A protein has these predicted regions:
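Active-site-proximal inter-transmembrane loops
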Residues: 107-128
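Membrane-anchoring alpha-helices and their flanking helix-loop junctions
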Residues: 1-109, 113, 134-169, 173-192
Length: 192
Protein backbone atom coordinates (compact mmCIF):
# COMPACT_ATOMS: atom_id res chain seq x y z
CA UNK A 1 0.00 0.00 0.00
CA UNK A 2 2.86 2.42 0.77
CA UNK A 3 4.19 2.05 -2.78
CA UNK A 4 0.77 2.79 -4.23
CA UNK A 5 0.31 5.92 -2.13
CA UNK A 6 3.84 7.11 -2.90
CA UNK A 7 3.34 6.59 -6.63
CA UNK A 8 0.00 8.40 -6.61
CA UNK A 9 1.59 11.36 -4.79
CA UNK A 10 4.42 11.47 -7.35
CA UNK A 11 1.91 11.44 -10.21
CA UNK A 12 -0.30 14.05 -8.52
CA UNK A 13 2.65 16.43 -8.13
CA UNK A 14 3.93 15.77 -11.64
CA UNK A 15 0.67 15.99 -13.58
CA UNK A 16 -0.73 18.60 -11.19
CA UNK A 17 2.19 20.88 -12.06
CA UNK A 18 1.68 20.22 -15.77
CA UNK A 19 -2.02 21.09 -15.79
CA UNK A 20 -1.75 23.94 -13.27
CA UNK A 21 0.93 25.60 -15.41
CA UNK A 22 -1.23 25.20 -18.52
CA UNK A 23 -4.18 26.77 -16.68
CA UNK A 24 -2.07 29.67 -15.38
CA UNK A 25 -0.73 30.38 -18.86
CA UNK A 26 -4.21 30.09 -20.38
CA UNK A 27 -5.38 32.83 -18.02
CA UNK A 28 -2.62 35.03 -19.46
CA UNK A 29 -3.78 34.27 -23.00
CA UNK A 30 -0.93 31.84 -23.68
CA UNK A 31 -1.80 28.64 -25.48
CA UNK A 32 0.59 26.13 -23.93
CA UNK A 33 -0.37 23.00 -25.86
CA UNK A 34 1.18 23.47 -29.30
CA UNK A 35 1.58 19.76 -30.03
CA UNK A 36 0.90 19.05 -33.71
CA UNK A 37 -0.63 22.50 -34.30
CA UNK A 38 0.25 23.93 -37.71
CA UNK A 39 2.84 21.23 -38.32
CA UNK A 40 3.20 18.99 -41.37
CA UNK A 41 5.04 15.84 -42.35
CA UNK A 42 7.48 14.15 -40.00
CA UNK A 43 7.30 16.92 -37.39
CA UNK A 44 3.53 16.52 -37.11
CA UNK A 45 3.92 12.73 -36.94
CA UNK A 46 6.46 12.98 -34.11
CA UNK A 47 4.41 15.48 -32.10
CA UNK A 48 1.06 13.69 -32.51
CA UNK A 49 2.60 10.28 -31.77
CA UNK A 50 4.33 11.77 -28.71
CA UNK A 51 1.00 13.14 -27.50
CA UNK A 52 -0.65 9.73 -27.89
CA UNK A 53 2.23 8.13 -25.98
CA UNK A 54 1.88 10.65 -23.16
CA UNK A 55 -1.80 9.77 -22.86
CA UNK A 56 -1.12 6.03 -22.81
CA UNK A 57 1.53 6.14 -20.09
CA UNK A 58 -0.57 7.70 -17.30
CA UNK A 59 -3.35 5.23 -18.06
CA UNK A 60 -0.89 2.32 -17.85
CA UNK A 61 0.66 3.84 -14.71
CA UNK A 62 -2.65 4.24 -12.88
CA UNK A 63 -3.82 0.74 -13.82
CA UNK A 64 -0.47 -0.70 -12.70
CA UNK A 65 -0.65 1.22 -9.41
CA UNK A 66 -4.23 0.19 -8.69
CA UNK A 67 -3.47 -3.46 -9.48
CA UNK A 68 -0.16 -3.18 -7.58
CA UNK A 69 1.62 -5.04 -10.36
CA UNK A 70 5.27 -5.84 -9.91
CA UNK A 71 7.78 -8.62 -10.11
CA UNK A 72 10.54 -6.64 -8.40
CA UNK A 73 11.77 -6.86 -4.82
CA UNK A 74 11.39 -4.00 -2.37
CA UNK A 75 14.84 -2.44 -3.05
CA UNK A 76 13.89 -1.91 -6.71
CA UNK A 77 10.56 -0.40 -5.71
CA UNK A 78 12.22 1.94 -3.21
CA UNK A 79 14.75 2.98 -5.87
CA UNK A 80 11.82 3.61 -8.22
CA UNK A 81 10.13 5.83 -5.64
CA UNK A 82 13.31 7.89 -5.25
CA UNK A 83 13.80 8.18 -9.03
CA UNK A 84 10.13 9.09 -9.54
CA UNK A 85 10.23 11.76 -6.82
CA UNK A 86 13.44 13.15 -8.33
CA UNK A 87 11.75 13.24 -11.74
CA UNK A 88 8.75 15.15 -10.40
CA UNK A 89 11.11 17.60 -8.68
CA UNK A 90 13.16 18.11 -11.86
CA UNK A 91 9.98 18.64 -13.91
CA UNK A 92 8.45 21.16 -11.48
CA UNK A 93 11.76 23.03 -11.28
CA UNK A 94 12.04 23.16 -15.08
CA UNK A 95 8.49 24.46 -15.53
CA UNK A 96 8.96 27.15 -12.87
CA UNK A 97 12.31 28.19 -14.36
CA UNK A 98 10.83 28.47 -17.88
CA UNK A 99 8.26 30.98 -16.67
CA UNK A 100 5.96 31.90 -19.58
CA UNK A 101 8.29 30.45 -22.24
CA UNK A 102 7.16 26.89 -21.39
CA UNK A 103 5.22 25.10 -24.15
CA UNK A 104 4.17 21.55 -24.94
CA UNK A 105 5.35 21.34 -28.53
CA UNK A 106 6.88 24.25 -30.40
CA UNK A 107 5.21 27.41 -31.64
CA UNK A 108 6.77 29.47 -34.38
CA UNK A 109 4.37 32.35 -33.71
CA UNK A 110 4.76 32.80 -29.93
CA UNK A 111 7.49 35.11 -28.67
CA UNK A 112 9.58 33.18 -26.14
CA UNK A 113 13.05 33.53 -24.70
CA UNK A 114 15.91 31.05 -24.54
CA UNK A 115 16.06 29.96 -20.91
CA UNK A 116 19.59 28.97 -19.88
CA UNK A 117 19.59 29.71 -16.15
CA UNK A 118 18.58 27.67 -13.11
CA UNK A 119 18.18 23.97 -13.85
CA UNK A 120 18.78 24.74 -17.54
CA UNK A 121 22.44 25.27 -16.65
CA UNK A 122 22.81 21.50 -16.20
CA UNK A 123 20.23 20.17 -18.68
CA UNK A 124 18.95 21.56 -21.97
CA UNK A 125 15.78 19.47 -21.56
CA UNK A 126 14.98 19.12 -17.85
CA UNK A 127 11.21 18.85 -18.44
CA UNK A 128 11.76 15.81 -20.68
CA UNK A 129 14.32 14.48 -18.20
CA UNK A 130 11.67 14.84 -15.49
CA UNK A 131 9.16 12.91 -17.60
CA UNK A 132 11.71 10.15 -18.20
CA UNK A 133 12.64 9.88 -14.52
CA UNK A 134 9.00 9.73 -13.41
CA UNK A 135 8.29 7.05 -16.01
CA UNK A 136 11.35 5.01 -14.98
CA UNK A 137 10.51 5.41 -11.30
CA UNK A 138 6.92 4.23 -11.66
CA UNK A 139 8.10 1.41 -13.92
CA UNK A 140 10.51 0.18 -11.23
CA UNK A 141 7.77 0.38 -8.62
CA UNK A 142 5.07 -1.42 -10.65
CA UNK A 143 6.91 -3.29 -13.37
CA UNK A 144 4.84 -5.13 -15.95
CA UNK A 145 5.28 -5.64 -19.71
CA UNK A 146 2.54 -3.18 -20.74
CA UNK A 147 3.94 -0.39 -18.59
CA UNK A 148 7.43 -1.14 -19.92
CA UNK A 149 6.26 -0.90 -23.54
CA UNK A 150 4.26 2.30 -22.96
CA UNK A 151 7.06 3.99 -20.99
CA UNK A 152 9.86 3.11 -23.42
CA UNK A 153 7.70 4.16 -26.38
CA UNK A 154 6.95 7.54 -24.76
CA UNK A 155 10.60 8.14 -23.87
CA UNK A 156 11.60 7.32 -27.45
CA UNK A 157 9.02 9.81 -28.74
CA UNK A 158 10.36 12.48 -26.34
CA UNK A 159 13.84 11.91 -27.72
CA UNK A 160 12.60 12.17 -31.31
CA UNK A 161 10.77 15.39 -30.38
CA UNK A 162 13.95 16.87 -28.92
CA UNK A 163 16.28 15.81 -31.74
CA UNK A 164 13.98 16.31 -34.75
CA UNK A 165 11.75 19.18 -33.67
CA UNK A 166 12.89 21.21 -30.68
CA UNK A 167 16.61 21.48 -31.40
CA UNK A 168 15.93 22.58 -34.99
CA UNK A 169 13.36 25.11 -33.76
CA UNK A 170 15.74 26.53 -31.14
CA UNK A 171 18.56 26.84 -33.67
CA UNK A 172 16.26 28.57 -36.16
CA UNK A 173 14.79 30.89 -33.52
CA UNK A 174 17.83 31.74 -31.38
CA UNK A 175 20.76 31.03 -33.74
CA UNK A 176 24.20 31.66 -32.23
CA UNK A 177 22.78 32.13 -28.73
CA UNK A 178 21.42 28.58 -28.83
CA UNK A 179 24.61 27.16 -30.40
CA UNK A 180 26.70 28.69 -27.60
CA UNK A 181 24.31 27.24 -25.01
CA UNK A 182 24.33 23.84 -26.74
CA UNK A 183 28.14 23.78 -26.61
CA UNK A 184 28.08 24.28 -22.82
CA UNK A 185 25.18 22.09 -21.64
CA UNK A 186 24.36 18.47 -22.47
CA UNK A 187 21.00 17.44 -23.90
CA UNK A 188 19.86 15.60 -20.78
CA UNK A 189 22.26 16.18 -17.90
CA UNK A 190 25.65 17.73 -17.25
CA UNK A 191 27.83 20.51 -18.53
CA UNK A 192 30.48 20.05 -21.22
Amino acid sequence: MIYQVTALVILAVFYGCYFLKMLMQQRKGIRTDQIGQGKVGFVKFVEVTMKIATLLVPAAEVISILLNTTCFWAPFRICGAVIGALGATVFVTSVVTMRDSWRAGVSKTDKTELVADGIYQISRNPAFLGFDLVYIGILLMFFNPWLLIASVFAMLMFHLQIVNVEEDFLLETFGQEYLAYKKKVNRYIGRK
